[in-house]
Amino acid sequence: MLARAARGTGALLLRGSVQASGRVPRRASSGLPRNTVILFVPQQEAWVVERMGRFHRILEPGLNVLIPVLDRIRYVQSLKEIVINVPEQSAVTLDNVTLQIDGVLYLRIMDPYKASYGVEDPEYAVTQLAQTTMRSELGKLSLDKVFRERESLNANIVDAINQAADCWGIRCLRYEIKDIHVPPRVKESMQMQVEAERRKRATVLESEGTRESAINVAEGKKQAQILASEAEKAEQINQAAGEASAVLAKAKAKAEAIRILAGALTQHNGDAAASLTVAEQYVSAFSKLAKDSNTVLLPSNPSDVTSMVAQAMGVYGALTKAPVPGAQNSSQSRRDVQATDTSIEELGRVKLS
């Protein structure tokens, strides 16, 4: 009779706990086992036994023996990791934005005695603590930081729960925020902000592309000008080298011609040949005067070709006259002069004809 009364009292307390919390605790999901003297406790469970209404001991997994009527199983605690869905709730951020947020809580009972006698419903208590802690932590952050510092927010909630739930024999392993719902207007403003940020990035990237393009074009023009100047420089160097080679070749040819002419002048009748050449060039120069419309200076009697030739020969003779050695034959000189005069007269007759 006492056992039945005790079981009835335990069932009444359990129903009262369920009604107060509004949910069925995980630890009493399968009900309380009866005292059958010999009991087998499953793995990862802890059965709290009371003797005559006072805590007696905690049954370990395996075979256990109880005294009928005196001993009663009062609580059954699961030592497995428990997952609890934290209901959606409203919270206000630091910048006065109201959010709807929910989460998932992972916890484990570390001390069955504290979990049984420290709080009426440990799971419900931890859920309420998680909600209040989450509201408190969200009030410390602005809306932007809520999305950026999600991991740190979860860690702060876990630390706050563990500090408060230590006396309940419960340890919070982790807390994860599932969904964050913002008001429609705030969502629209956030979307506009995101679009503005994207447009800003696009503008920056476009300007950077334009700058890089301008730099590349300028660099290309610079390289083209450098190459063009180098090519022009090389062309001028080659042209100068060619002109220098041509001048040198002309100088060498002229020097060779002068050398040959000097050698020819030293031969027999060389002076006469030179005089003849000078006379030809003199007459040829005056013959071109009639063809060109130029203002020139003419001798006093341009029609007298013989006098012009004689004058040219006199100039050449004055330039080429050299002192004669004392032993030179004067008769030979006179003969040479006469021969030269004869040649000039013949040349005059040829020109006049």
UniProtKB/Swiss-Prot annotation:
Positions of region (Disordered): 324-353
UniProt modified residues of type Phosphotyrosine: 124
GO BP annotation list: CD4-positive, alpha-beta T cell activation; intracellular calcium ion homeostasis; lipid localization; mitochondrial protein processing; mitochondrion organization; positive regulation of interleukin-2 production; protein complex oligomerization; proton motive force-driven mitochondrial ATP synthesis
Entries under Pfam families matching the protein: Band_7 (PF01145), Band_7_C (PF16200)
Keywords tagged on the record: Acetylation, Cell membrane, Coiled coil, Cytoplasm, Cytoskeleton, Lipid-binding, Lipoprotein, Membrane, Mitochondrion, Mitochondrion inner membrane, Phosphoprotein, Transit peptide
GO cellular component entries: actin cytoskeleton; immunological synapse; membrane raft; mitochondrial inner membrane; mitochondrial intermembrane space; mitochondrion; plasma membrane
Residue stretch of the organelle transit peptide: 1-28
Location of N6-acetyllysine modifications: 145, 233
Membrane topology classification: Peripheral membrane protein; Lipid-anchor
Compartments where located: Cell membrane; Mitochondrion; Mitochondrion inner membrane; Mitochondrion intermembrane space
Gene Ontology MF annotations: cardiolipin binding; GTPase binding; T cell receptor binding
Protein name in UniProt: Stomatin-like protein 2, mitochondrial
